[in-house]
Each structure stands twice: as structure tokens, then as C-alpha cells.
């Protein structure tokens, strides 16, 4: 049967199964009987029955487990499912859980064509075995479904229509009006980075300085400082710009936190416990997060530092549990403090939060100039970070790895949502309940309240999103009704939050003209490819976001309208570029790009349009190249000859690592957070993540282009990457703009990859070194099989030993 594209939203309710025989009842198929020569028996013990929802082989939902109801399990669970899948059937799979995995009971198939009219379908569907024969007793599952095609979404392709836009539906945290946001590009912006970017109302964009603001927030806190991080390092300074000194600015972060705790401020830290940081491997762990060092530094001090494992969904099998707690992480990066009121003279305090991609650790301090060699005797002499070369060290010289990242400061009601996230996590994994009781300080710390008036041109509406589950946080709704309303989904026993992926999908479906996406890992798990490799069902989350992007472009091509997506990636994922893991990720990345380009080229051909697909979807990376200057730092040693390290040092070039996780839509809506576009970040039961989505209600792209802070931030980023400002860049959806950016990036790549360079690279934005064939296949850019100075293939290579769970 031919597949039908379901692109929209699917509402599903799973009620119950009737006449089910479980426990010790034999459930088997003829094919399995022939293979195993004995019947397959459900696990003995307490039956734990659950059901999952698949669109063909893509897993899109799962119920909680029902215990001690082996004959008539009742879930009454509802699901709000974003879909963009070619499918034949909606499949309901019923299983009995056991410690190793789960035992299949049967599957029920509902043909997709029954849903296409958009009418509600409420029926009992027969459960079949693997040979498509009815299981014993003729068991059926009661389900209700209704499909809403994307064209029925009132926000589809219209952007944010008005200031009354309610935010992303079915989420744990509602959208909060009356907020204020500071947007940060990189950890620091020096005074000589001064692009003149006009905004509406005769204003000009003014950049903010992340680590200066974090330093001030910690220094001025009087009651509490709460921090979570993938890594938190104690031996580095937040303030390093000698032209912008601060009193006490040379203090190390660890010393500053101890000082505040000794003053009576409640300092609590949740730091990911890297299980590889043990003596059998190496003390700082495979990821070099310094978690053990940080814990030891604060031991017996007034700072409460807790190392917390990423515990798995409790319903997982034993093997899955060991896997998740070892390879998945706590990836949220937040700081929450009490702060002074914005108006002087008040003794009251308020809550201020920081959310984004920058950890408080070594290797993160950088500026928009991203120097490779010229800061090695100043800002980066004691903070030399270069994990892409074996044996790299400051004593051997550069290039260091520059770090491009994005962060935000949140004020107003949304700051309290970040605080509540920390409190949920602390109560689950923090040990002693030593959270500050803010009710006892209600005369001092004001409750959640707007910090701007509705008619203030600079007011923001902000919403907080997460990937997390009950293994990492307390206080989620427990009833199916409450969970569905909050957009929560079930693990086998845990409630899971996946609102970050919902936010991205919701944002992708709305815009009219353009996307700018920065992400450190961008993967579409290529469902068919995984099926061939693993012969198994797989989750849909990592597939859907890139597919939504390509479907969006296709819809615009079919409507005869302009639309452009700009994606900025790291040249390769951080690590040794020839390694199996990096090459496997690059292979998945190539497949993702290829899937998207095939969709676009097919649409162009179907509509008789002869145009470069890079006018609609274009990929970039960042890099720098510097000529040597007199007075530069001279290392006392040299890298080993004929290595990536020595070649990069000789050619004076290296990638700028893109760690940012950000999307800008139509210059009116922005998402900033910690999550990558991959399975582990979007799943909810793997890496824990946090993000915010925001817009300014007085700066929307309704009748004319938006010219608020988001536009200014986007133009400032482009100035950082391109080294120029141009009127063409103000309209990113236009053919003139995308061709200008592509032309400049092509030129910069040629300069970056050339044998010699007489001057500094004039900008950092490089064409991602791939070519697109006539049918959409992603191929090598001529002469670029390997990344410069390496023997690492640009297109990557499929790993024969690393499972996709590690590389997607």
C-alpha cells in the first residue's frame, strides 16, 4: 500500500484493551515458532502492560505501564503528536515489560487513509500477532484519533499574527508576558566591536556582555545563587578584558562562590556526574568536565555542590539503565540569583535567571573576534582549550579552539520558571532539602510579576521549555488528564517533558520568510537507514525537525513564495576529527542534508523551477585564519611533525567551534537554549536540556519587517561572521541576500582552504564544504575530500561498531 504524508497534528487517545490474556499465557507467531522451536512466553511475575503508537516504524508515543491488570488494562491517555511522516498505518503495539526489555503481545493497525478527512475516528481495533493473525480471545484495543492537516493550523505560514499570540500549546510552562531579555553573542563583547545597526523608533542595537553580567549577578546576590551545568570549573576568571576592569574581577569563580556562601548567601550547585571520571579511566573523565575536581574543591565549604547522574527512565531495562546513566548527561546551563530591583532606592529583591549554551567552565571565554593565536599570552594563556588534537597544550602553541556560543538573561515572571526548574531538580537529586524558602522572604523578594508595562516597546513575552523526566525532577502532573494538558508524555514508568522539540516544530511551522539556525549537532536519524542497520523501530523526534524545515521550504516553493533557511554548524563535532564517533556523526549529518535537499529539488523540478537549491537551504561553518604578527606568544615546544596539530599551526587556521543552540524566525521570534537538534537532546529521557522562546509583541513582522532586538541581534551576529554590514542583509528571505551571503561564504572558504594567505581572513562565515548533485545527493566539494590540515573525511563514514544511540 502506498504511503501517505501525514503533515500536521495527530490527536490520539488510547483507552483500553479487552479480553487480554497475559501472565503465563503463550503468545507466539508461526514464524517465531519456526525460528525458536518453542513458544514465546510473556514474562512471569507482575504483568506491566503498556501500549505504543507508531507511524509505520516511527515511534511517536507510549503509554505508562499498567500493573496487575493483565486482562483489561485501561490507560485513558491522550497524545498531541506533531507529525511529518509518510505512513501507511497508525500502529498500536501492546507489550508486557520485563527487566531485560519487553515481550510483544501484539499490534493493531489503523490505515492512515481513514484519518485524511479530518473526522474523529473512535473504534476498537483488532490486535494481531507478527503474522497478522488475531491473537487469542480476539483481543481489541479501543482508540480515538483525529488528524489535523498542517493547512488547518491558523498560524501556518503566517508568523506571529499579533501580540496576543499565546505561545506553544500543551507545555508545562505557559508563556509569560511582561518580561525583559538580554541576548548574548559569545561570553564577552569588547568595546571595539561596534556595529551600527538601526532598530525601529530611531534606536540602535547595543550588545550585552554575558560573563560581565553573570559576574555582577553573583557578586550582588544577597540571598541565593543556584547553578546547574554540564561542567562547572572553579579555576577561571569571568572578567578578562583589561579595558573593562571590575573591582575584584580577577577572582576565580570557585573563590567567588565560596566568598558569597561565607557571606550567608545560599549557594547550591547541580553538576553532571560524569561516570567516566574515575581512576580506572581518568580523573577528569572522557569529557574533561572537572566534576570530581569541582566537588573536591567545595567539600567542607559553605557551597553545596552535588554531582548528579543522569538517571534513566525507571521503566527501562537493566541494560538501558546502565547505558543512559553512563553516556547521557545533564546538559542544562542555568544561573538563578536574587537581584536588586531595576529602580533605585528599593530594598526589595527579585529573581533573575540566565539560560543558554555557555557552561561556567574553561574553554568558553571568547569574543566575536575568535583569535587563534593572539590571545595566547593574555586571556587564553591559562585557559587553553584544544580537544581536537592529541597532546595539545599551551606550551606547544596554537591554534586554540575558538568558541562561539549564545546565552540569555531573563527577567520577570519567566525567571521564576527557571527557578522552579532548579527546585524540581534539587528535590530529586540534591540530597538535603536546603533550598531557600522564598515564602519566608516574601517581604523581601517580590513574587512573580511583570518588569515592563504592556505598552513598553521593549517588553518581551517568554516561554520556558525543557527536555527532562522524573528521573531528574520532582512534581510533574500524575493523572493522564493533567499530563496531556501540560504536553507531557509517558515513559514506561516516568513522566517525560519534550517541550523543546515541540517549540522548534511550532516555530518552524509558523514563519513567513526565513530561518537562521545555529546548532552544534544537526541530525536527522534517517528512519529507513536505521531500520536497515538495526532492523528495529526507532524514535521519531530527531527525524521530525529537519523534515519540518524541508517541508516548510517545499510548501513555499509550491506557493510561489520566497523562503530561506540558513544553518550554521561546526566544521565537525568537537573531538579528534578522524575518530569513529566524529566520522559517524558526520555521516548522519550528510544524510540529514541529503534528505532535505532531495525534498527541495523534487519540489523545484515539479514546479518547473531551475534554481540553485542553496537559494532555499544553505549550510555554513565558522573558521578563522591569522597571519603571524610580531610580538605573538612563542611556545617553548612544538607539536609532533606530520600531525593535524602541526599542519594547523603551520597554516595558521582552525575552525571556530559552533556550540550555539539558537533559531531566529522572521526576525521576530527566537529560541535559545542548551539543546542540539538530535535525538539525545530532544528525547526528554536522555540528556536533560533547557531553552527559552521569546518575542517582542511590539516588534512583529506583520505589515513590515520586524526591527526589534531580535533583528538587531541577528544583524550583529552576521556582522561578527561576515565582517561587514550591508543593506541587503536586512532582508534574509530575499534572493539578493542569500546569494550575497553564499558568495561571501564561498570566497571565505576559498581563502581559508588555500595554500597560503597574505592577510587575516576578512570574516568567519565559511561555506560548509559540500556540493549538491542534481538529484539532491550530497557530495564532496571538488578538491575537498578531507577537512583542511586533517585526514578526516568531510562526508564522514558509517560506524560498524558505534550504535546510533551514541551518535544521534
From Swiss-Prot:
Active site residues of this protein: 331, 333, 338, 659, 661, 666
Top-rank lineage group of the source organism: Eukaryota
Taxonomy of the source species: Eukaryota, Viridiplantae, Streptophyta, Embryophyta, Tracheophyta
CC cofactor: Ca(2+)
One MF term in the entry's GO annotations: calcium ion binding
InterPro entries: C2_dom, C2_domain_sf, PLipase_D/transphosphatidylase, PLipase_D_C, PLipase_D_fam, PLipase_D_pln
PANTHER family: PHOSPHOLIPASE D, PHOSPHOLIPASE D ALPHA 1
Keywords for this protein: Calcium, Hydrolase, Lipid degradation, Lipid metabolism, Metal-binding, Repeat
GO biological process: phosphatidylcholine metabolic process; phospholipid catabolic process
Protein name: Phospholipase D alpha 1
Domain notes: C2 domain is a calcium-binding fold, and the binding promotes the protein association with membranes. A lower affinity toward calcium can be anticipated for PLD alpha due to the absence of two potential calcium ligands.
Signal sequence residues: none
Binding site for a 1,2-diacyl-sn-glycero-3-phosphate: 331, 659
Taxonomic source organism: Spuriopimpinella brachycarpa
